[in-house]
Amino acid sequence: MFSCIACTKADGGEEVEHGARGGTTPNTKEAVKSLTIQIKDMALKFSGAYKQCKPCTGSSSSPLKKGHRSFPDYDNASEGVPYPFMGGSAGSTPAWDFTNSSHHPAGRLESKFTSIYGNDRESISAQSCDVVLDDDGPKEWMAQVEPGVHITFASLPTGGNDLKRIRFSREMFDKWQAQRWWGENYDKIVELYNVQRFNRQALQTPARSDDQSQRDSTYSKMDSARESKDWTPRHNFRPPGSVPHHFYGGSSNYGPGSYHGGPPMDAARTTTSSRDDPPSMSNASEMQAEWIEEDEPGVYITIRQLSDGTRELRRVRFSRERFGEVHAKTWWEQNRERIQTQYL
């Protein structure tokens, strides 16, 4: 950028300097003049660079404003904190004037946190940012133990959980399968989820959920069922005129016992635990209209009696220990007419 100027050294001081100046060549003068012009241009550029700039603190004529943002959810100590903003180019996004309350309505954040945490929640502190939650009452939560099985718990203040209800998807479980699953997995659920007690009032009178479109069947745990010795056996619910048939052991998938959770006919041969519960009160009417008949060992037929007295065949189940898929289809094709005539 700068041109180098050759200088001669001598032992003379001032006189030598004057002599050297006087003996400069035209090329040296031109170089000095060029250097002087360059320095002046640079000085003008640097001195005039900030003439059009205004201090960040601004003045009354500055288009940018230094405002104080008022947050309703912040402590008083945090209010009035200045937020400086730097200007941008003409094509950039215009600066946001935080002094204008129209950008942030006073109640927007308050209403947001009120809708989430309720009207009795504490506000958020700007210094600690801690949310104070109301701990009154047990907190309910749901766990999906496996696909189609949802269990609702309530956290107890003393630790552990209260088992509220169990829901089985009707697309994956019928009532009998749900009862068997509960009997086989009861101990695992109690240990895994630290179940301390059961809400008897909620479980003895379970309410039907309004969203029946989910096709969930509610089964409840009731301790009184284990204490009662007078539970009516399954065959007492059979309508008059039906042929009495009894269950036999030997199927791990379709073990003996009541279709609706009654005690098994033979406790030594059943695969269903004695902890099986009776169904909820909302299913009592279904118990009187639907039952299972064993046509032969390993073949279980579910029959329903309608309100007009007619019967319909609900399903036919085969024991996997006795029937393969092809064998079951063949058996059904051969015995379909006989089953419909005999049971319907």
UniProtKB/Swiss-Prot annotation:
Record domain BRX: where: 139-194, 289-344
Region Disordered, annotated ranges: 203-286
Signal peptide: none
Compositionally biased intervals (Basic and acidic residues): 223-233
Pfam families cross-referenced by the UniProt entry: BRX, BRX_N
Chief localisation class: nucleus
Chain intervals with Low complexity compositional bias: 248-264
InterPro entries reported in the protein's UniProt record: Brevis_radix_dom, BRX-like, BRX_N
Keyword Repeat: yes
Tree of life domain: Eukaryota
One GO process term, biological-process aspect: auxin-activated signaling pathway
Topology with respect to the bilayer: Peripheral membrane protein
Subcellular location: Nucleus; Cell membrane
Family statement drawn from the similarity comment of this UniProt entry: Belongs to the BRX family.
Reported function: Acts as a regulator of cell proliferation and elongation in the root and shoot. Regulates roots architecture and primary root protophloem differentiation. BRX, BAM3, and CLE45 act together to regulate the transition of protophloem cells from proliferation to differentiation, thus impinging on postembryonic growth capacity of the root meristem. Probable transcription regulator. Regulated by the auxin response factor ARF5. Polarly localized in vascular cells and subject to endocytic recycling. Required for CPD expression and for correct nuclear auxin response.
Subunit structure comment from the entry: Homodimer and heterodimer with BRXL1. Interacts with NGA1 and ARF5.
The protein, known as: Protein BREVIS RADIX
Organism name: Arabidopsis thaliana
